[in-house]
Amino acid sequence: MAGNSKDSKILAYKDMINQLNKTISTQTELIQSLQKTLEADRLEKENLRQQIEYLTKKLFGTSSEKRKDIAGQLNLFDEAEQEADPTWEQELPDDITVPEHKRKARRTHADLFKNVPSCDEIISLPEEERNCPTCGTQMECIGKEFVRHEFRFTPAKGKVVNIYRETYKCPECAISEEHPDDQTFVKAPVQEPLIPESYASESVVGWAMHQKYQNGLPLNRQEEDWKQLGVPLSRATLANWIIYCAENYLRHVYNYFHRQLRMRKYLMADETRVQVLNEPERNPETDSWMWLFRSGEDGLPPILLYHYTETRAKFHAASFLQGFSGYLETDGYQGYNNLPDIKRCSCWAHVRRYFTDAIPKGKEYDYSLPAVQGVQFCSKLFDCERYSKAKNHTAEQRKQFRLEKEKPILEAFWNWLDQQRPNKGTRLAKAVNYAQNRKDTLMTYLEDGHCSLSNNLSENAIRPFTVGRKNWLFSASPKGAASSAIVYTMVEMAKANDLNTYKYLTYLLSQRPNDKMSDEQLEQLAPWSETAKANCQN
């Protein structure tokens, strides 16, 4: 009996131990699960904190990516760079001017107004004050002295021009007895109106285009301006004029630019959203797209074209670039991938921007942070590019310089990037993934000295559209959006080639471009032509 009792107790203890082990195992699993949950919550909280910090910086902070490195600060990247090329630091300081430290010379009044007409105003003594206060004799003017410069503005004024044309008759034929019925009449030639049955002129339509697409002034505000001048020009009338002239005149110049652009070997592209009302079978809130295609740094006159489409589908880019063969610099949009006969270059400014956005607030100079190190790698590449431009390198010299100086930096960057293990979902993880996913296209620029390190030129070219969009908000119709793309093209082409935008628009309208013009004739309307320069420079 005693033995059975002892065995029973042993079995009971074993069962108790097993139960305790199960409880411990369950508790351990629960603790591990809770730890994972807490860690996930912590990471989510950190990601949300970074997102709030990022959005706050975007909303209230500076948008510049420029940074000043602390003098004498040696960091991880500097060590790798010095090992790659020990002569690097000996070369750069003598040749690169740091913009932040360069003081601009003060501009004089003559510099400010060198392109503005001037005249003299003589202030004379009133007639009744020209008698000598001592003896009363009439005084004589013996000279004049300069007092000051004044800049004066004459507000815009409109006028109605009543156009007549003269008719000429041959007096001999009128009295001829041999041919009494063959009288000769000749009328002076008159250019056809800009718009049939309209009082619009190129100066008025050109001004409306200039105000909206250069100055960002919506048509409703222009309507108010015209009222102040006593002219009842409605926004609908102005819109119709712009659309008519863009489609019937400027489009022919636009198409010529398009043909010229596709003949280049180095292009850049960017795109942005635009809201367009009354698109067939589409909600007004649906995003439409404005594309910007431009020539690269090929040493030829710049060409910039805006292009409106309803969607961002890949075939739009393929259709617009049909016939182009060469290098295309873009942002990260995948729609540019696998375009025929095109080698894609990705933008290093975007890579730098991703790392910049991943830097915590107030930690811009904490060189132990991977995000700061990533920015430094990118900044060194841009330093090299500035150095090359300062040296006026040819395309071949720039290619060799990049292979000698920038390729070691790139190799160090990719090795460093492979060692990064950022937490999933963080801004640093996005920066690392963005660069890793585009490694091949980020290296393409090394192949040709004409290729650019960044897509900043196209981003700068599309910025006037994004600024103007904040004012006019939307296009009322697809036709209006397409016309806007054409006029924006003319405005940006004028600016890129150093022409006065209003003068260039009125010049184009005065020439009445049409589909019967040859490319040789359209070439004379291009902003780089001597004819356009003579008529449209300030």
Regions found by a protein language model. Name each.
Residues A2-G3, E129-R130, E140, T167-K169, ...:
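Catalytic center-proximal scaffold of phosphoryl-transfer enzymes
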Residues M1-Y199, M268-A269, R402, L525, ...:
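Short, flexible loop/hinge motifs at secondary-structure junctions
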